Amino acid sequence: RFIYFDELQKKIKKLPIKKLSIIPVIDRNTKRLIDVIDSEKLNLLDVRKKKQKLNVSVIIMAGGKGTRLLPYTSVLPKPLLPVNRKPTINHIIDRFGNYNVKNFFVTLNYKSEILKTYLKDLSKIRTIKTIEEKKPLGTAGSLFLIKNKIKNDFFLTNCDTIINENYNDMYKHHKTEKNDVTVVTARKKFKIPYGVCDVKENGFQMKEKPELKYYVNTGYYILSKNCLSVLKKLEYLDFNNFLLKCKKYKKKIGILKHLNNFLKVYNIRY
């Protein structure tokens, strides 16, 4: 018994919490294991509760070339590559749409005309504004073009990340912690397939195939509107350097350790 990733939100609601042991979550295309759901995680996902309206905007960074997905991105921009027969950007917009989020901004550069044509149809349902970079601005530089258009707090996401979580809970964490920027992380395990030698002044130690655990950046962020004040000019700016600017101006940066229930598009084999 298992659940396909694209059916997770729909089918998980019907799972009996008390009788649930372990349910694998499988990618439909590759048939690979993505996650495992148990009763504790099902409770944490909180998908049974009625979703409340989320009063935020969403910025989707869609200007990159998607070089890790060549040759497919030489034809289509990465946001339009399908995950289980549905463009990645639709997965992102639809998930926020479940929380009645209607205000979206999409930053464009590579193959922008294709994306603008596609998003024009989606704009009939939700308010989707496109912001075109005349030259690549990095993962945070285009925020300068939007800073005067944003009226409230917002989620910022890469266009290649799909997260199945309760966005209300994520935003509540951001507000409770009084963060200006919340970086959404996931716990990942990396097993080194070799013995690792540790040489120190007091001796030698070897660990056989150690497993390392880290909290990694998912590419999802929650930001308060006030943090955009650190952007003084239009420039190329990676998100790491944006965080350094936030620290310089005494903005509070925190992390959200989430359930690892996310998918990166570049992990998919077509």
Predicted regions and their residues:
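N-terminal glycine-rich phosphate-binding loop and ensuing alpha1 helix
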Residues: 51-115
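Short hydrophobic beta-strand motif reused across regulatory alpha/beta modules
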Residues: 34-42
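The conserved cystathionine-beta-synthase
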Residues: 2-21, 25-29, 43-47
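A short, conserved acidic/glycine-rich loop-to-beta-strand motif
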Residues: 177-187
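Short beta->alpha linker loops
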Residues: 3, 7, 21, 29, ...
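Short loop/turn microsegments at loop-to-beta-strand junctions
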Residues: 20-23, 194, 218
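Catalytic-core segments of class I nucleotidyltransferases/pyrophosphorylases
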Residues: 154-155, 162, 168-175, 188-192, ...
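Conserved N-terminal catalytic core of the sugar/cofactor nucleotidyltransferase
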Residues: 86-162, 169, 230-234
